[in-house]
Each structure stands twice: as structure tokens, then as C-alpha cells.
UniProtKB/Swiss-Prot annotation:
GO terms for molecular function: protein transmembrane transporter activity. It holds the Pfam family TatA_B_E. One of its GO terms (cellular component) is TAT protein transport complex. The chain crosses the membrane at residues 1-21. Residues 43-80 are annotated as: Disordered. Keywords: Cell inner membrane, Cell membrane, Membrane, Protein transport, Translocation, Transmembrane, Transmembrane helix, Transport. Part of the twin-arginine translocation (Tat) system that transports large folded proteins containing a characteristic twin-arginine motif in their signal peptide across membranes. TatA could form the protein-conducting channel of the Tat system. This is Sec-independent protein translocase protein TatA. It is a single-pass membrane protein. InterPro entries: TatA/B/E, TatA/E. Residues 55-67 have a biased composition (Basic and acidic residues). Residues 68-80 have a biased composition (Polar residues).
Length: 80
């Protein structure tokens, strides 16, 4: 059971035309295309928001690292 051959694809296409009609098929294809376009757009926006969050986290961490490096070290040893 591999890929359908050309005659099988033609039979499937004929059944689709009979079920939906020739006028409805372009509308279905247009709806499918716009759905895919919206899905890709949402995926791209999600990736961009993750990148911006990561950049803002790095910017917030940078000043914290500078403060810890500049604080003096206290002597905590006990003298006898």
C-alpha cells in the first residue's frame, strides 16, 4: 500500500468534484490557503516574541552581574 497511482488520484478527484461541486472547490482551496498563511504568521510571531523575551532577560541580567563584581569582599574569619 504505497502512494496512489494516477488513475486512483483521478477517481478521488472525481468524487471530490461530485461531493462539493466545481464552484465550491476554489472556495475550499482559498480557505485552506488562508488558514495555512495565518498559521505560519502566528508561528513567526511566537518565535519573534520568544527572541525578544530572551534579549530582555539578558539585558536585565547584565546590571546584576556588574553589581556582584563590584561589591567588596568581607572578612568573615574569626580571630583567636
Amino acid at each position: 500500500m504505497g502512494m496512489p497511482s494516477m488513475p486512483e488520484l483521478l477517481v478521488i478527484l472525481a468524487i471530490v468534484v461530485l461531493l462539493f461541486g466545481a464552484k465550491k472547490i476554489p472556495d475550499l482551496a482559498k480557505g485552506l490557503g488562508s488558514g495555512i498563511k495565518n498559521f505560519k504568521k502566528a508561528m513567526k510571531e511566537d518565535e519573534e516574541s520568544e527572541v525578544s523575551v530572551t534579549k530582555s532577560e539578558k539585558i536585565e541580567e547584565a546590571p546584576k552581574n556588574e553589581k556582584s563584581a563590584s561589591t567588596p569582599i568581607q572578612d568573615t574569619t574569626k580571630q583567636a
